[in-house]
Design a protein with these regions (language model features):
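A glycine-rich helix->loop->beta "capping" turn
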Residues: 67-70, 90-101, 110, 149
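A short, exposed helix-loop element centered on a Lys and neighboring polar residues
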Residues: 137-138
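Conserved glycine-rich Rossmann-like NAD(P)H-binding loop of the short-chain dehydrogenase/reductase
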Residues: 30-59
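Canonical Rossmann dinucleotide-binding motif of NAD(H)/NADP(H)-dependent dehydrogenases/reductases
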Residues: 3-35, 39
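Residue(s) in the substrate-gating loop at a strand-loop-helix junction
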Residues: 158
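Substrate-binding pocket helix/loop in short-chain dehydrogenase/reductase
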Residues: 112-114, 121-126
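The beta1-alpha1 cofactor-binding region of Rossmann-like NAD(H)/NADP(H)-dependent oxidoreductases
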Residues: 54-55, 75-87, 119
Length: 167
């Protein structure tokens, strides 16, 4: 029995681990090939979780390959539109098309309240969590439109968008 996305290609940001890895593995289980990117380094000094690494991204690739699906990976910062576009273009060239965008990359501020968040940390969060999503979709959506088959765009967010942090 074919999976729900059999033969499709998905572009996933923040794919080295966590939700991004989970999306890559699940979509591969359902039959998709994957274009996976991650910055693979710390962006903000105030983040409270360890930074993703190139080894993390390689592990995601191995998990997808073990499902007999193809995967193209790149270390890319979603704040860098030109690098995003180059990674998506390369992935589409290798895999033939694009059907799904999962803009998942994001950072936190270590749980700091607004009055303790530095301007630099705020700028990093906006540049990754908002502008990075727009840049990711902008870099990828022309391939979906060019395919003429329709497609899906999935944008993830923080639980902070649903429930305020205490303090």
């Amino acid at each position: 029995m074919a999976g729900r996305v059999e033969g499709k290609v998905a572009f996933i940001t923040g794919a080295a681990r966590g939700q991004g890895r989970s999306h890559a593995v699940r979509l591969a289980q359902e039959g998709a090939d994957i274009i996976a990117i991650d910055v693979c380094k710390r962006i903000s000094s105030n983040e409270d979780i360890p930074a993703p690494t190139p080894d993390d991204l390689a592990e995601t690739a191995d998990l997808v390959k073990n499902l007999n699906r193809r995967i193209v990976t790149a270390e890319v910062d979603v704040r860098d539109y030109d690098a995003l576009k180059a990674a998506v273009d390369s992935g589409v060239e290798q895999l033939g098309k694009l059907d799904i965008i999962v803009a998942n990359a994001g950072i936190g501020n270590g749980g700091q309240t607004l009055d303790h968040t530095s301007e630099a940390d705020w700028t990093d969060m906006i540049d990754v969590n908002l502008s990075g999503v727009w840049k990711s979709v902008k870099a990828a959506v022309p391939h979906i439109l060019q395919g003429g088959r329709g497609g899906s765009i999935i944008l993830t967010s923080s639980v902070g968008g649903l429930k305020a942090y205490p303090h």
